[in-house]
Protein backbone atom coordinates (compact mmCIF):
# COMPACT_ATOMS: atom_id res chain seq x y z
CA UNK A 1 0.00 0.00 0.00
CA UNK A 2 1.40 3.39 -1.02
CA UNK A 3 -0.63 6.58 -0.75
CA UNK A 4 0.02 10.29 -0.59
CA UNK A 5 -2.18 13.36 -0.64
CA UNK A 6 -1.99 17.10 -1.07
CA UNK A 7 -4.27 20.10 -0.55
CA UNK A 8 -3.55 23.67 -1.58
CA UNK A 9 -5.87 26.65 -1.33
CA UNK A 10 -5.58 30.42 -1.66
CA UNK A 11 -8.19 33.17 -1.34
CA UNK A 12 -8.17 36.78 -2.52
CA UNK A 13 -10.50 39.35 -0.99
CA UNK A 14 -11.19 41.76 -3.85
CA UNK A 15 -13.43 44.17 -1.94
CA UNK A 16 -16.21 44.12 0.63
CA UNK A 17 -18.56 42.26 -1.72
CA UNK A 18 -16.32 39.98 -3.80
CA UNK A 19 -13.73 37.31 -3.10
CA UNK A 20 -12.25 34.49 -5.16
CA UNK A 21 -10.43 31.34 -4.11
CA UNK A 22 -8.46 28.64 -5.89
CA UNK A 23 -8.26 25.14 -4.45
CA UNK A 24 -6.54 22.01 -5.69
CA UNK A 25 -6.24 18.59 -4.07
CA UNK A 26 -5.49 14.99 -4.93
CA UNK A 27 -4.42 11.63 -3.53
CA UNK A 28 -2.31 9.24 -5.65
CA UNK A 29 -2.86 5.70 -4.38
CA UNK A 30 -1.33 2.31 -5.19
CA UNK A 31 -2.48 -0.75 -3.29
CA UNK A 32 -2.56 -4.52 -3.52
CA UNK A 33 -6.04 -6.00 -3.76
CA UNK A 34 -7.69 -9.03 -2.19
CA UNK A 35 -9.22 -11.91 -4.16
CA UNK A 36 -12.34 -13.73 -3.06
CA UNK A 37 -11.69 -17.17 -1.57
CA UNK A 38 -13.66 -20.21 -0.45
CA UNK A 39 -14.11 -21.57 3.04
CA UNK A 40 -12.17 -24.64 1.96
CA UNK A 41 -9.07 -22.54 1.31
CA UNK A 42 -9.45 -20.75 4.65
CA UNK A 43 -9.76 -24.07 6.47
CA UNK A 44 -6.81 -25.69 4.68
CA UNK A 45 -4.48 -22.86 5.69
CA UNK A 46 -6.21 -22.01 8.98
CA UNK A 47 -6.20 -18.41 7.78
CA UNK A 48 -9.31 -16.33 7.13
CA UNK A 49 -7.10 -13.64 5.58
CA UNK A 50 -5.86 -15.91 2.80
CA UNK A 51 -5.36 -14.02 -0.47
CA UNK A 52 -4.78 -16.02 -3.65
CA UNK A 53 -3.80 -12.93 -5.68
CA UNK A 54 -0.12 -12.95 -4.74
CA UNK A 55 2.88 -15.25 -4.96
CA UNK A 56 6.68 -15.22 -4.89
CA UNK A 57 8.74 -14.14 -7.89
CA UNK A 58 12.47 -14.66 -7.40
CA UNK A 59 11.91 -14.68 -3.65
CA UNK A 60 9.88 -11.45 -3.57
CA UNK A 61 6.14 -11.07 -3.02
CA UNK A 62 4.23 -9.97 -6.12
CA UNK A 63 0.49 -9.25 -6.23
CA UNK A 64 -1.38 -9.81 -9.50
CA UNK A 65 -4.16 -7.42 -8.49
CA UNK A 66 -2.84 -3.91 -7.95
CA UNK A 67 -5.04 -0.83 -8.05
CA UNK A 68 -3.61 2.59 -8.87
CA UNK A 69 -5.61 5.80 -8.95
CA UNK A 70 -4.98 9.51 -9.19
CA UNK A 71 -7.77 11.98 -9.92
CA UNK A 72 -6.67 15.52 -8.98
CA UNK A 73 -9.32 18.24 -8.67
CA UNK A 74 -9.08 22.01 -9.14
CA UNK A 75 -11.83 24.44 -8.03
CA UNK A 76 -12.23 28.18 -8.68
CA UNK A 77 -14.83 29.80 -6.43
CA UNK A 78 -16.35 33.29 -6.49
CA UNK A 79 -18.33 34.59 -3.51
CA UNK A 80 -20.59 37.62 -4.06
CA UNK A 81 -22.17 39.24 -1.01
CA UNK A 82 -25.01 40.98 -2.81
CA UNK A 83 -26.27 42.56 0.37
CA UNK A 84 -26.46 41.81 4.07
CA UNK A 85 -29.08 39.11 3.51
CA UNK A 86 -28.14 37.62 0.15
CA UNK A 87 -25.05 35.71 -0.94
CA UNK A 88 -24.22 34.11 -4.31
CA UNK A 89 -21.51 31.44 -4.44
CA UNK A 90 -20.31 30.10 -7.80
CA UNK A 91 -17.71 27.40 -8.44
CA UNK A 92 -16.13 26.04 -11.60
CA UNK A 93 -14.19 22.81 -11.25
CA UNK A 94 -12.18 20.32 -13.24
CA UNK A 95 -11.27 16.74 -12.33
CA UNK A 96 -9.15 14.44 -14.44
CA UNK A 97 -7.12 11.32 -13.91
CA UNK A 98 -7.05 7.56 -14.10
CA UNK A 99 -7.94 4.45 -12.18
CA UNK A 100 -6.55 1.05 -13.11
CA UNK A 101 -6.62 -2.46 -11.67
CA UNK A 102 -4.30 -5.21 -12.87
CA UNK A 103 -5.24 -8.87 -13.22
CA UNK A 104 -3.91 -12.09 -14.70
CA UNK A 105 -5.18 -13.14 -18.12
CA UNK A 106 -4.40 -16.37 -19.93
CA UNK A 107 -5.04 -18.09 -23.26
CA UNK A 108 -5.28 -21.80 -24.08
CA UNK A 109 -3.48 -22.73 -20.87
CA UNK A 110 -4.11 -23.87 -17.31
CA UNK A 111 -5.86 -21.50 -14.93
CA UNK A 112 -3.08 -19.73 -12.96
CA UNK A 113 -5.23 -19.03 -9.90
CA UNK A 114 -4.06 -21.35 -7.12
CA UNK A 115 -7.57 -21.76 -5.67
CA UNK A 116 -9.23 -22.71 -8.95
CA UNK A 117 -11.64 -25.49 -8.01
CA UNK A 118 -9.80 -28.15 -10.05
CA UNK A 119 -6.76 -27.63 -7.80
CA UNK A 120 -8.62 -28.09 -4.52
CA UNK A 121 -8.69 -31.32 -2.48
CA UNK A 122 -12.50 -31.34 -2.65
CA UNK A 123 -12.37 -31.78 -6.43
CA UNK A 124 -10.36 -34.99 -6.19
CA UNK A 125 -12.15 -38.35 -6.08
CA UNK A 126 -9.35 -40.66 -4.91
CA UNK A 127 -8.41 -40.51 -1.22
CA UNK A 128 -4.69 -40.67 -1.96
CA UNK A 129 -5.06 -37.63 -4.25
CA UNK A 130 -7.14 -35.82 -1.64
CA UNK A 131 -4.38 -36.39 0.91
CA UNK A 132 -1.68 -35.31 -1.55
CA UNK A 133 -3.47 -32.08 -2.47
CA UNK A 134 -4.21 -31.32 1.17
CA UNK A 135 -0.57 -31.79 2.10
CA UNK A 136 0.60 -29.62 -0.79
CA UNK A 137 -1.81 -26.85 0.12
CA UNK A 138 -0.75 -26.84 3.74
CA UNK A 139 3.01 -27.09 3.20
CA UNK A 140 3.94 -25.60 -0.19
CA UNK A 141 3.30 -21.91 -0.91
CA UNK A 142 4.01 -22.49 -4.60
CA UNK A 143 0.74 -24.45 -4.55
CA UNK A 144 -1.41 -22.16 -2.40
CA UNK A 145 -0.08 -18.95 -3.98
CA UNK A 146 0.61 -17.85 -7.57
CA UNK A 147 3.70 -19.54 -9.00
CA UNK A 148 5.13 -16.61 -10.95
CA UNK A 149 8.31 -18.37 -12.06
CA UNK A 150 6.22 -21.17 -13.58
CA UNK A 151 4.19 -18.66 -15.60
CA UNK A 152 7.39 -17.14 -16.98
CA UNK A 153 8.78 -20.56 -17.90
CA UNK A 154 5.59 -21.46 -19.77
CA UNK A 155 5.78 -18.19 -21.72
CA UNK A 156 9.45 -18.82 -22.56
CA UNK A 157 8.44 -22.18 -23.99
CA UNK A 158 5.71 -20.47 -26.03
CA UNK A 159 8.35 -18.08 -27.40
CA UNK A 160 10.50 -21.03 -28.44
CA UNK A 161 7.51 -22.61 -30.20
CA UNK A 162 6.68 -19.34 -31.96
CA UNK A 163 3.34 -19.08 -30.15
CA UNK A 164 1.61 -16.23 -28.39
CA UNK A 165 2.10 -15.71 -24.68
CA UNK A 166 0.03 -17.98 -22.48
CA UNK A 167 -0.09 -15.58 -19.53
CA UNK A 168 -0.08 -11.79 -19.23
CA UNK A 169 -0.93 -9.09 -16.73
CA UNK A 170 -3.63 -6.75 -18.00
CA UNK A 171 -4.72 -3.42 -16.55
CA UNK A 172 -8.38 -2.45 -16.67
CA UNK A 173 -8.34 1.31 -17.00
CA UNK A 174 -10.79 4.16 -16.64
CA UNK A 175 -9.36 7.54 -17.67
CA UNK A 176 -11.80 10.31 -16.84
CA UNK A 177 -12.43 14.03 -17.24
CA UNK A 178 -15.18 15.91 -15.45
CA UNK A 179 -16.15 19.58 -15.68
CA UNK A 180 -18.43 21.08 -13.04
CA UNK A 181 -20.17 24.42 -12.65
CA UNK A 182 -22.33 25.13 -9.63
CA UNK A 183 -23.96 28.35 -8.47
CA UNK A 184 -26.01 28.74 -5.29
CA UNK A 185 -27.86 31.70 -3.83
CA UNK A 186 -28.97 32.08 -0.24
CA UNK A 187 -31.33 34.77 1.04
CA UNK A 188 -32.37 35.34 4.63
CA UNK A 189 -36.04 36.30 4.82
CA UNK A 190 -35.98 36.71 8.59
CA UNK A 191 -34.37 35.25 11.69
CA UNK A 192 -36.08 31.90 11.21
CA UNK A 193 -36.54 31.53 7.46
CA UNK A 194 -34.25 31.53 4.46
CA UNK A 195 -34.50 30.70 0.77
CA UNK A 196 -31.89 28.71 -1.11
CA UNK A 197 -31.61 27.78 -4.78
CA UNK A 198 -29.02 26.96 -7.33
CA UNK A 199 -27.76 25.41 -10.52
CA UNK A 200 -25.44 22.41 -10.91
CA UNK A 201 -24.09 21.43 -14.33
CA UNK A 202 -21.65 18.57 -14.93
CA UNK A 203 -19.97 17.01 -17.94
CA UNK A 204 -18.24 13.63 -17.61
CA UNK A 205 -16.24 11.61 -20.11
CA UNK A 206 -14.64 8.30 -19.19
CA UNK A 207 -12.50 6.15 -21.43
CA UNK A 208 -12.82 2.48 -20.47
CA UNK A 209 -10.22 0.11 -21.90
CA UNK A 210 -7.69 -2.62 -21.21
CA UNK A 211 -3.95 -2.42 -21.73
CA UNK A 212 -1.25 -5.08 -21.49
CA UNK A 213 0.73 -4.17 -18.41
CA UNK A 214 3.28 -7.02 -18.40
CA UNK A 215 3.92 -9.75 -21.00
CA UNK A 216 5.50 -11.95 -18.30
CA UNK A 217 8.34 -12.84 -20.65
CA UNK A 218 6.07 -13.57 -23.64
CA UNK A 219 6.60 -12.13 -27.10
CA UNK A 220 3.08 -11.17 -28.19
CA UNK A 221 -0.65 -11.59 -27.62
CA UNK A 222 -3.45 -11.99 -30.19
CA UNK A 223 -6.44 -9.71 -29.63
CA UNK A 224 -9.29 -12.24 -29.75
CA UNK A 225 -12.01 -13.23 -27.29
CA UNK A 226 -11.22 -16.77 -26.15
CA UNK A 227 -14.71 -17.21 -24.67
CA UNK A 228 -16.28 -16.38 -28.04
CA UNK A 229 -13.89 -18.88 -29.63
CA UNK A 230 -15.17 -21.50 -27.22
CA UNK A 231 -18.87 -20.68 -27.56
CA UNK A 232 -18.88 -20.06 -31.33
CA UNK A 233 -16.41 -22.63 -32.54
CA UNK A 234 -15.43 -22.09 -36.17
CA UNK A 235 -16.78 -18.52 -36.26
CA UNK A 236 -13.65 -16.45 -36.88
CA UNK A 237 -15.58 -13.16 -36.93
CA UNK A 238 -17.40 -13.29 -33.60
CA UNK A 239 -14.17 -13.92 -31.70
CA UNK A 240 -12.51 -10.73 -32.97
CA UNK A 241 -12.21 -7.87 -30.49
CA UNK A 242 -11.36 -5.49 -33.35
CA UNK A 243 -13.18 -6.26 -36.61
CA UNK A 244 -11.10 -3.64 -38.44
CA UNK A 245 -7.90 -5.44 -37.48
CA UNK A 246 -8.60 -9.19 -37.22
CA UNK A 247 -6.09 -11.26 -35.25
CA UNK A 248 -4.29 -8.08 -34.25
CA UNK A 249 -0.97 -8.72 -32.54
CA UNK A 250 -0.49 -6.64 -29.39
CA UNK A 251 2.37 -6.26 -26.97
CA UNK A 252 3.17 -4.58 -23.67
CA UNK A 253 1.60 -1.12 -23.47
CA UNK A 254 -0.95 -1.79 -26.23
CA UNK A 255 -4.70 -1.39 -25.81
CA UNK A 256 -6.76 -4.52 -26.47
CA UNK A 257 -10.00 -6.27 -25.57
CA UNK A 258 -12.31 -3.27 -25.35
CA UNK A 259 -12.00 0.49 -25.70
CA UNK A 260 -15.05 2.76 -25.37
CA UNK A 261 -16.21 6.02 -23.83
CA UNK A 262 -18.91 6.60 -21.24
CA UNK A 263 -20.65 9.90 -20.58
Give residue ranges: language-model regions.
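Outer-membrane beta-barrel pore proteins
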Residues: 1-2, 11-17, 82
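Residue-level detector of the transmembrane beta-barrel scaffold of outer-membrane proteins
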Residues: 9, 19-23, 46, 87-89, ...
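Outer-membrane beta-barrel transmembrane strands
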Residues: 60-103, 164-200, 207-208, 252-263
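Transmembrane beta-strands of outer-membrane beta-barrel proteins
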Residues: 1, 11, 23-25, 91-93, ...
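Acidic/polar loop-and-plug regions of large Gram-negative outer-membrane beta-barrel proteins
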Residues: 19-77, 100-174, 234-251
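Signature of Gram-negative outer-membrane beta-barrel scaffolds
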Residues: 168, 193-263
